[in-house]
């Protein structure tokens, strides 16, 4: 049985975790990866002394799968200060720790984003979600997050000034139409742990998963054209025959029969600039509330981890949810907006690179924490893994990798 030809399509988090689980059972899978390194959407480039993550990403230390698969001390995680810097109407102020200790948030600062009743409700919600299991969260009726916040009684002030800009950056959509299941899950994770990045960039996370593999082979620069039956056709024309195929990437890219079965994925544009020094000077996310900005959120990455810049300049990560501007115009518009909120002249923000991330998060109507492993099986030979089966998070990507591996192992038991 152990000489079975098992191919995994995609070396993202789900593909790597699937390989880890298959190796534990004695198999030696082969991963076909279209790019030149592991990580899928979680990648880091080294450019001119800067570490550029593909999109602003963090790891939440409370994620269950993070505890299962990652050695957090070895990643030398650098944590964000909880809360946010709010840039509003030519002014800025700090809201510290609203998701964990809302009652401790200093009155004056909080009064600018919400009412005293909001503070009490935030505290109540934090306590409720700490006690609520992840399973119970994902069994709740699915309502849009914005509706949920209104139903809970939060004021328009705190929804506009904090919840919208903060969760837009997480959900990558402007109107908070994402299921409140996801809101509760993320809120719970923030209240139980920290948002962090590995000292040397997000790429360190898939690298650590890869280091747990010993008999798995990874073929880089090997994009798959299509999968039919037990045959995998690569873009270079090579055909591979497989006993089992784990599709740990968006399946409609490689399986013609699944075209049109998935909604349009969420997109984001991530721009990087260097500046003589950070105007925030703290490891915190900066939010721009309101609907009249191009920029949604900003972070000086070297305020969080100094290794992100080996120069004498600061590295600014800027997230833009949507824009039709050509890159040159977009860069100029972002620089002008940065000047408005910081007082630093636009030309001092030196543009480094932009990442147009077309498949940042899956579009999902029905968010789940898990699924029966039988749902990972498409045919006797083809199995699916990936966050698009559950919810848009690195936790879900790793969960689905474990589930699809279990489904494959089950297919080898005599009763299946």
Question: Where are the language model's segments positioned?
Answer:
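N-terminal Rossmann-like FAD-binding beta1-loop-alpha1 element of flavoenzymes
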Residues: 4-31, 409
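Hydrophobic/small residue at the entry helix of a nucleotide-binding pocket
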Residues: 13-14, 38, 400
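Glycine-rich FAD pyrophosphate-binding loop
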Residues: 23-47
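A short alpha-helix-loop-beta-strand transition element characteristic
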Residues: 44, 67-88, 155-161, 265, ...
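Dinucleotide-binding Rossmann-like beta1-alpha1 core, especially the glycine-rich loop
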Residues: 48-128, 132-136, 145
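Active-site/ligand-binding neighborhood in enzyme catalytic cores
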Residues: 124-226
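Mid-domain catalytic core of redox enzymes
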Residues: 225-332, 340-341
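Conserved flavin/dinucleotide-binding core of flavoenzymes
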Residues: 307-416
């Amino acid at each position: 049985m152990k000489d079975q030809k098992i191919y995994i399509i995609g070396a993202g988090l789900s593909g790597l975790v699937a390989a880890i689980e298959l190796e534990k059972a004695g198999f030696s899978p082969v991963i076909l990866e279209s790019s030149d390194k592991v990580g899928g959407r979680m990648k880091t480039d080294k450019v001119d002394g800067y570490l550029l993550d593909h999109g602003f990403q963090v790891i939440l230390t409370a994620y269950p799968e993070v505890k299962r698969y990652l050695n957090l001390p070895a990643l030398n995680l650098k944590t964000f200060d909880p809360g946010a810097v709010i840039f509003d109407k030519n002014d800025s102020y700090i809201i510290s720790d609203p998701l964990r200790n809302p009652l401790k948030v200093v009155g004056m600062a909080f009064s600018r984003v919400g009412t005293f009743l909001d503070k009490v409700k935030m505290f109540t919600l934090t306590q409720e979600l700490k006690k609520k299991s992840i399973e119970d969260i994902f069994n709740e009726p699915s309502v849009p997050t914005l509706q949920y916040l209104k139903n809970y009684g939060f004021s328009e002030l705190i929804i506009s000034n904090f919840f919208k800009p903060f969760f837009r950056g997480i959900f990558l959509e402007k109107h908070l139409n994402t299921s409140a299941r996801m809101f509760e899950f993320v809120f719970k994770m923030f209240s139980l742990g920290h948002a962090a990045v590995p000292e040397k960039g997000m790429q360190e996370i898939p690298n650590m998963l890869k280091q747990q593999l010993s008999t798995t082979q990874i073929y880089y620069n090997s994009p798959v054209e299509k999968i039919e039956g037990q045959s995998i056709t690569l873009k270079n024309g090579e055909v591979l025959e497989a006993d089992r195929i784990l599709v740990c990437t968006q399946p409609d890219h490689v399986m013609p029969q699944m075209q049109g079965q998935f909604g349009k994925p969420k997109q984001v544009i991530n721009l990087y600039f260097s500046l003589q020094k950070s105007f925030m000077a703290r490891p915190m996310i900066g939010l721009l509330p309101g609907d009249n900005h191009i920029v949604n959120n900003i972070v000086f990455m070297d305020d969080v981890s100094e290794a992100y810049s080996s120069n004498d300049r600061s590295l600014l990560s800027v997230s833009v949810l949507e824009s039709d501007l050509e890159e040159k115009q977009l860069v100029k518009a972002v620089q002008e907006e940065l000047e408005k909120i910081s007082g630093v002249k636009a030309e001092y923000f030196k543009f480094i690179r932009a990442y147009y991330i077309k498949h940042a998060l899956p579009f999902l109507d029905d968010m789940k924490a898990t699924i029966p492993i039988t749902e990972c099986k498409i045919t006797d030979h083809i199995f699916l893994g990936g966050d698009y089966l559950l919810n848009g998070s690195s936790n879900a990507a790793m969960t689905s990798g474990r589930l699809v591996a279990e489904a494959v192992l089950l297919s080898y038991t005599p009763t299946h």
